[in-house]
Amino acid sequence: MKKFLTLVLALVMALSRAACGGDKNKDNGGTDADASANKISNNLVFSTGGDGGTYFAVGGVIAQHVSTNTDVKVTSVASGGSKANILLLDSGDAQLGFSQSDVMAYAYNGTSTFADDGAITSFSTVANLYLEAVQIVTCDASIKTVADLKGKNVSIGDAGSGVYFNAIDILGAYGLTEQDIKPQYKGFSDSADALKDGKIDAAFVVAGAPTVSITDLSTGKDVHLVSIDKEHADALIAKCPYYMTITIPADTYKGLDGDVQTVAVGAVVLAADNVSDDAIYAFVSDIFEHTDELSHAKAKEMSIETAANITSVPYHPGAARYYAEKGITVPTK
């Protein structure tokens, strides 16, 4: 499956380049600049996330709706997640991509997971779509707090991924380090498989809830989510203000004993700066004028107010135009 998705991604990228052309370092400009052949206006590759995560599912729904109802054709593809998507935008291999709100800030400032890469500023914000909950998943009922993860086999996401840094932040809030656990570096689907097979004790999953991989796991195993208590959540947010508290309702997954308190980051759509203003305007307007037609539970959480609340990375001019029509001013380059 992964090999198939890789081949599809390579083919789509090749077709996109051939059809679109353009220099990704060209100026954003305004409506007049959009007429330039150097602006990409169609056949956009939307790099999402792993095939067991919410990025992949939501991205597919959005891509299909935009392609069907506008002149902009969008193809969603699986990817390695936030950091991989930003690198794909920068290289020109994708024109749209999902990112956690913390990871995009790391990229724009060249910090944390992007410390070795240096600052990447060739992308802009399109919309903050929904919150991604930090879900600490286990099938071991004896693991009740983050502190209980000490000495356990714990998947903390792919090395260098957004999930990895979220896990490190949360472990740190409880006085734990990576060395205090037996870390495993797995994506969502692989983590779910490892939990199912008893190869790991817990896994960090950062995605909109419900998440496909956890839902699937709960059909055959007793699944538990570990809460982050208010004291530790408040301390984490004071240190890392891009987190916010969130409650995962008990009915989100089969078998949960009650509501789960945790923290979350934003799920943000980004665009390469060389995508035309008109294309991004059409993309954004299609989402927010038709959220009731998007066949995914996360669509109910999407709002223009949330979409326009990012401050760490400026907005694409095409997105800014749409928000301005709704009476909201957002920062642009």
Outline where the language-model segments fall.
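Short, low-complexity disordered leader/linker segments with a strong preference
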Residues: 1-43, 333
